[in-house]
UniProtKB/Swiss-Prot annotation:
Protein family: Belongs to the TomB family.
Species per Swiss-Prot/TrEMBL record: Escherichia coli (strain K12)
Location(s) in or outside the cell: Cytoplasm
Organism phylogeny: Bacteria, Pseudomonadati, Pseudomonadota, Gammaproteobacteria, Enterobacterales
GO cellular component term of the entry, any: cytoplasm
Protein name, as recorded: Hha toxicity modulator TomB
Length: 124
């Protein structure tokens, strides 16, 4: 993202990063042969943390550039917090997993709405 990129492009980048995080998290959950035991120091969890930090930095730049778009930023922050909390503990419980999934669903609905509000024909 730079100061000249159109808003729809910045939204698409944020959406891509958040979708990547979501799919990486799902893959991590599916690969767990230990049930609900988690290792926050594993290579995959460290990679998830790096991706979370990257998205948080990107979201901060987005917030500075589009300070009026608070709902999307709040939803991204909530999703990143829920993701970090889920994968930084040694045990994963159903309540935390459901909270993470719900915040992800809310975030991706926000992306759909933001995309509708910023179609390619209006933001060039």
């Amino acid at each position: 993202m730079d100061e000249y990129s159109p808003k729809r492009h910045d939204i698409a980048q944020l959406k891509f990063l958040c979708e990547t995080l979501y799919h990486d998290c799902l893959a991590n959950l599916e690969e767990s042969n230990h049930g609900w035991v988690n290792d926050p120091t594993s290579a995959i969890n460290l990679q998830l943390n790096e991706l979370i930090e990257h998205i948080a930095t990107f979201a901060l730049n987005y917030k500075i550039k589009y300070n009026e778009d608070n709902k999307l930023i709040e939803q991204i922050d909530e999703y990143l917090d829920d993701t970090f909390m889920l994968f930084s503990s040694y045990g994963i419980n159903m309540q935390d997993l459901q909270k993470w999934r719900k915040s992800g669903n809310r975030l991706f609905r926000c992306f759909v709405n933001a995309t509708k509000e910023n179609p390619a024909s209006l933001s060039c």
